[in-house]
Amino acid sequence: MSATPETGTLVLADLTGYTAYLSQSEIEHAPTIAGDLLETIVGRLEPPFRLAKLEGDAAFLYAEDGRADGSLQLDAVEAAYFAFRRRLRSIDTATSCDCNACALAPRLDLKVFVHHGAFVRSRIAGRDELAGPDVILAHRLLKGAIAAKRGSGFGQFTAAAVTALGIRTDELDMATARESFDHVGDVDTFVMDLDARWTAESDRRQMSIAPEAAIVDESILVPADPADCWAYLTSPSLRPLWEGPIVITETSPGARRGVGTTTQCVTGRLATLEEIVDWQPYDHAAWRLAVPGIGPVDATADLEGADDNTRLSLRWAAAPGAIAGPDDVERIRAERRAALDRLASVLGSRVGLAEV
């Protein structure tokens, strides 16, 4: 029986410096630490991506077309790199072990390769394998000129991936680079400096709302992992499923949701304006809202994984110029409580990104 071709995004997350690390570290410790790092990376990529297989010091994942929009896929790539760097930092600062495996772990880094194309699934030795020219091309990037030149701390996207994900490379400061491979030819790619984004993220102060300043302070345990919860919380196509009949118009720099994205949410004749002012995928987001009849409001959402669930905490605070009276505050609280209850209900009954 012939296989049915599919199209989607192909991702390879590769640990840089793994061979040197393994050869210089204790064999009883190094594979465990490297495995922990790969598990951290895959945990942030999956969902929206699915793990195809682990390939030594790399993880190969994919997402079929229609599984998640381009912004959510970019969120996953960035979140994986940030989670990897945070895990390295915790190993470096929190361990008292003096073995080489722990001491040398901070020398590891990560590079991510993203391509979009066609593939088929084949059953080999009892396992599903992805195959096709585009799968080969994605793997060729691992040994390309950019990987050899830059070393680590970057994401390399083929032109096909950029087009499929709707990325505006100039607005995301992505450098152009051409690869050339035998039997494939020239491949135009774009490089994202993940290390620079991590540095900027580490230096940026997170927006927060103190409990005593909050006019809304709600927390709920939802039956989904942080990636699914984040998607339903932020995606214009998923928000109406729990926020009600709203029409959302979004404008994003670089075709990616993040700091600077503005949104107009229209319910009936009323429109709420939103601007994202803090964006840490799967962990934290903050918005500045212009709410009809009330004025400027600051809002934050914090997500924390708890087994297979997520603790979602939502806070709103009146910003300077707001005119919220006691009745307004009580109405807002009731609306947010009801919305979060609907979100939990939707997430409890849906087929999540991990199972689609």
Residue ranges with predicted function:
Residues L289-S345, L353-V356:
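Beta-strand/loop substructures that line and gate deep hydrophobic ligand-binding cavities in soluble
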Residues I33-P48, A79-A83, R87, Y232, ...:
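Generic non-transmembrane alpha-helical segments
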Residues M1-D75, A79:
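Catalytic NTP-binding/metal-coordinating core of nucleotidyl cyclase/transferase enzymes
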Residues T163-D217, A224-A227:
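C-terminal tail/extension regions appended to the core domain(s) of diverse proteins
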Residues R204-P253:
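Hydrophobic ligand-binding cavity/cleft-lining segments
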Residues P240-L241, E250-D298, R311, A338, ...:
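Glycine-rich portal/gate segments that line the openings of hydrophobic small-molecule binding cavities
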Residues G66-T176:
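Catalytic beta-strand-to-alpha-helix segment of the class III nucleotidyl cyclase homology domain
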